[in-house]
From Swiss-Prot:
Any single biological process term in GO: mismatch repair
Organism whose genome encodes this protein: Burkholderia lata (strain ATCC 17760 / DSM 23089 / LMG 22485 / NCIMB 9086 / R18194 / 383)
Residues covered by the RNase H type-2 domain: 26-214
Listed GO CC annotations: cytoplasm; ribonuclease H2 complex
GO molecular function, one term: RNA-DNA hybrid ribonuclease activity
Entry's localization field: Cytoplasm
EC nos: 3.1.26.4
Keywords on record: Cytoplasm, Endonuclease, Hydrolase, Manganese, Metal-binding, Nuclease
UniProt-recorded name of the protein: Ribonuclease HII
Cofactor note: Manganese or magnesium. Binds 1 divalent metal ion per monomer in the absence of substrate. May bind a second metal ion after substrate binding.
Domain of life: Bacteria
Catalytic activity annotation: Endonucleolytic cleavage to 5'-phosphomonoester
Binding site for a divalent metal cation: 32-33, 124
Functional description taken from the UniProt entry: Endonuclease that specifically degrades the RNA of RNA-DNA hybrids.
Length: 214
């Protein structure tokens, strides 16, 4: 499993103590995922520590933003965050562990890949992965906490790009349009062509398509 991260550098103790996230004694990373629901492709997670000296306007839940806005914010987050890491869990890991545990694994990888050690990880949703740092779950955190919003954008944009790449390999499914979600056209393609190696065989519609071609 590979992770995409900011160039590694360790913040000095003075720099780490200078954050102001309304939690002056904390170094907070926001964590979110993309791709729990689709029938194909990996689940992707991102962890982001924002730099208060370089604020980013317009951060929000990635699902509330247009693709153009997400792409623009992605570049700003990569350029301005103090540290970020994007990681994933593969289709094989999803099928072996189940989607919940694979998502927790991707989140853990993202946090552990940060070049600056956080003291607190704020996780979107109602569950936290097992981490070596303190963690708290925040329901709707991707719309409420800027660093989680940033993580949601990195995860979403990264995964969408992965699915565009998968479309080049498996064009009959339309991954570039629906990102692996179970749209009517995707389900029709599954029934006609059967699943490819990128499909999650632990998901019921994929299993049903397999049964049709046996």
């Amino acid at each position: 499993m590979t992770a995409v991260r900011a160039p590694r550098r360790r913040a000095s103790s003075d720099e780490q103590g200078g954050f102001d996230f309304s939690r002056p004694d904390e170094i907070v990373c926001g964590v979110d995922e993309a791709g729990r629901g689709p029938l194909a492709g990996p689940v992707v997670a991102a962890a982001v520590i924002l730099d208060p000296a370089q604020p980013i306007d317009g951060l929000d839940d990635s699902k509330a933003l247009s693709a153009k806005k997400r792409d623009a914010l992605y570049e700003l987050i990569v350029a301005r965050s103090l540290s970020y890491c994007v990681a994933s869990a593969s289709v094989d890991e999803i099928d072996t562990l189940n989607i919940l545990h694979a998502t927790m694994l991707a989140m853990k990888r993202a946090v552990e890949g940060l070049s600056v050690l956080p003291t607190l990880a704020q996780i979107d949703g109602n569950r936290c992965p097992t981490l070596t740092v303190r963690a708290e779950a925040i329901v709707s955190g991707d719309a409420l906490v800027p660093s989680i919003s940033a993580a949601s954008i990195l995860a979403k944009v990264t995964r969408d790009r992965m699915l565009v790449d998968l479309h080049e390999r498996f064009p009959v499914y339309g991954f570039n349009v629906h990102a692996g979600y179970g749209t009517a056209k995707h389900l029709a393609a599954l029934r006609e062509h059967g699943p490819c190696e990128a499909h999650r065989r632990s998901f019921a519609p994929v299993r049903a398509a397999l049964d049709l071609i046996r």
